[in-house]
């Protein structure tokens, strides 16, 4: 009798426990993905503000960025969930401030090692210094592949995180770097797995110097993602997260979730994605947004996120994953401002605000930055000349900017002598003008400012072109690769060269009235033209420049700009008036 009672008690307990255990096993596992993009080696606070909502419908400018603050923000978000992973969507390095670029972005990689970055997709800028230097970023070492000496402070250990390049194939058909990764969270029957796919935009080959990517093939983004997502699911992934260096252009605030009015090249990729994708972390456009793509296409209810640039924002993505049915049951995301330190700009003081979280500097990361800054600061702070006002990169209706004209004039001055190439005109691409050049109150500009404006380290190239070839290059502003009438890439001309364009005319007939110092450009006449080495290789889809002959090498772009501004003296002349390009068709 007692034995029967004992068995009954055990059975009752088992019956009572079983549902509880089943519920525990079925309860979703929450995974957090902490994401950012387009960091561009912004180790120090970039003197950047994000406009954010304030009470009563007002707005406040919040100072953001700086890797020591970013590290602290990541740590705080991680503390909220041990099941966390940190990712980026490309352009982690290059086009960087001098404190990182002077050292080939080694300090940026080291800072990310300290932060605990897990995965980083390649972006177009990861290829700026060529494939071998990118591999050195991953694998470490001190072998020299550029004009700068690596390992100037310490031997470089390489990235402890994995760089992903799913759509970049080498000559043998293999990916240059791994294309995917998998992270496991939880144990036993509560274990879930999240797969990651990392890739860059297919047009990367048009955005970097061709010689640095010789032999590489950049494949279709959607095809690559879909194939990788299927493989990850077959390997047991319960969720698939895409890290892609391509993006969107939002109309609303940094943390708006509506997708209202959103545009951009990434939309063409999203419309073709496999429905097994759960999250798309994007970049490239330097915007911030969170879009529930299910509002656009109910059959593809994935999140699409982006976090501005320079470590200004972190996207905190939460996934609830069912460990029994092996799928995501809920997802959400928020963009978190990385509030850093106050500064003043032309609009006034940008102060810290209690309306948004503040983050202290991470001491280990701050010490790393200080060590490199001690070496770089004298170079950055060196005054090189004066300007009468700011040279802004913002273009007028014809696509011409003061900054672009200033750089083109510097290129011409550096190469116009008979012993320096005999150039009579020069062009620079508007995409190479990285930032505005804003002098101090007394007009002084520093080498660090010039480097921020021209950070790519391109050499000048002088070549002989016919007037017809020059015309063909200008036509490619509107019709070559990704360059279109809707999204042109404008060449910035040097003084003395003028022309007009009429977008109502058919392709190949839009450029009119080219003149040099008032005289018409003859299609069959020859001219010595200066461009940067990126354009000379056909960069930005300006393949017409490859037709040039009698090439002569020149100084680096930033050195030409330094010499030109230094020669202006204590009383510099007025800045270029942006009257070299005439738009003949209405906007």
Question: How would you label these PLM feature ranges?
Answer:
Residues 1-5:
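Positively charged n-region of N-terminal signal peptides that target proteins for export
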Residues 14-21:
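C-terminal segment of classical bacterial N-terminal signal peptides
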Residues 23-36, 58-67, 75-81, 233, ...:
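Non-catalytic terminal accessory segments
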Residues 12, 215, 460:
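Short, flexible active-site loop motifs that bind/organize anionic cofactors or intermediates
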């Amino acid at each position: 009798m007692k034995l029967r009672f004992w068995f009954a008690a055990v059975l009752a307990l088992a019956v009572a426990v079983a549902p509880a255990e089943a519920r525990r096993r079925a309860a979703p596992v929450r995974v957090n993905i902490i994401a950012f993009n387009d960091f561009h080696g912004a180790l120090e606070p970039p003197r950047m503000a994000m406009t954010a909502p304030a009470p009563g419908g007002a707005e406040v400018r919040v100072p953001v960025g700086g890797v020591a603050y970013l590290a602290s923000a990541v740590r705080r978000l991680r503390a909220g969930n041990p099941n966390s992973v940190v990712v980026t969507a490309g352009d982690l390095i290059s086009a960087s401030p001098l404190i990182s670029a002077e050292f080939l972005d080694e300090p940026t990689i080291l800072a990310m090692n300290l932060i605990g970055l897990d995965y980083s997709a390649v972006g177009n800028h990861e290829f700026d210094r060529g494939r071998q230097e990118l591999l050195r970023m991953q694998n470490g070492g001190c072998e020299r592949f550029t004009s700068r000496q690596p390992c100037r402070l310490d031997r470089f250990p390489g990235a402890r995180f994995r760089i992903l390049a799913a759509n970049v194939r080498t000559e043998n058909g293999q990916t240059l770097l791994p294309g995917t990764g998998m992270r496991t969270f939880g144990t036993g029957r509560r274990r879930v797995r999240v797969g990651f796919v990392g890739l860059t935009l297919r047009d990367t080959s048009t955005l970097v110097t061709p010689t640095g990517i010789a032999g590489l093939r950049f494949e279709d983004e959607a095809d690559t993602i879909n194939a990788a997502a299927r493989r990850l699911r077959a390997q047991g992934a319960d969720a698939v997260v895409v890290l892609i260096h391509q993006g969107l252009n939002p109309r609303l605030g940094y943390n708006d979730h509506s997708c209202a009015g959103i545009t951009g090249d990434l939309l063409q990729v999203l419309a073709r994605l496999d429905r097994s994708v759960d999250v798309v972390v994007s970049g490239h456009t330097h915007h911030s947004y969170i879009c529930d793509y299910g509002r656009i296409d109910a059959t593809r209810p994935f999140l699409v996120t982006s976090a501005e640039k320079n470590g200004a924002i972190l996207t905190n993505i939460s996934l609830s994953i069912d460990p029994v049915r092996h799928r995501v049951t809920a997802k959400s995301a928020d963009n978190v401002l990385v509030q850093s330190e106050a500064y003043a700009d032309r609009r006034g003081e940008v102060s810290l605000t209690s309306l948004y979280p503040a983050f202290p500097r991470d001491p280990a990361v701050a010490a790393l930055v200080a060590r490199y800054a001690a070496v770089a600061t004298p170079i950055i702070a060196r005054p090189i000349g004066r300007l009468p006002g700011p040279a802004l990169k913002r273009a007028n209706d014809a696509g011409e900017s003061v900054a672009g004209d200033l750089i083109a004039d510097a290129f011409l001055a550096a190469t116009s002598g008979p012993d320096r190439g005999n150039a009579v005109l020069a062009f620079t691409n508007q995409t190479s003008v990285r930032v505005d050049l804003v002098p101090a109150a007394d007009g002084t500009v520093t080498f660090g400012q010039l480097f921020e404006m021209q950070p790519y380290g391109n050499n000048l190239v002088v070549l002989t072109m016919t007037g017809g070839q020059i015309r063909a290059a200008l036509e490619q502003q509107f019709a070559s690769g990704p360059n279109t009438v809707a999204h042109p890439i404008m060449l910035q001309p040097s003084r003395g060269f003028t022309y007009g364009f009429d977008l109502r005319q058919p392709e190949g007939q839009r450029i009119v009235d080219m003149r040099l110092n008032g005289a018409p450009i003859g299609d069959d006449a020859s001219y010595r033209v200066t461009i940067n080495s990126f354009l000379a290789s056909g960069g930005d889809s300006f393949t017409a420049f490859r037709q040039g002959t009698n090439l002569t090498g020149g100084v680096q772009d930033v050195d030409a700009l330094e010499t030109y501004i230094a020669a202006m003296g204590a009383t510099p002349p007025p800045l270029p008036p942006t009257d070299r390009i005439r738009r003949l068709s209405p906007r």
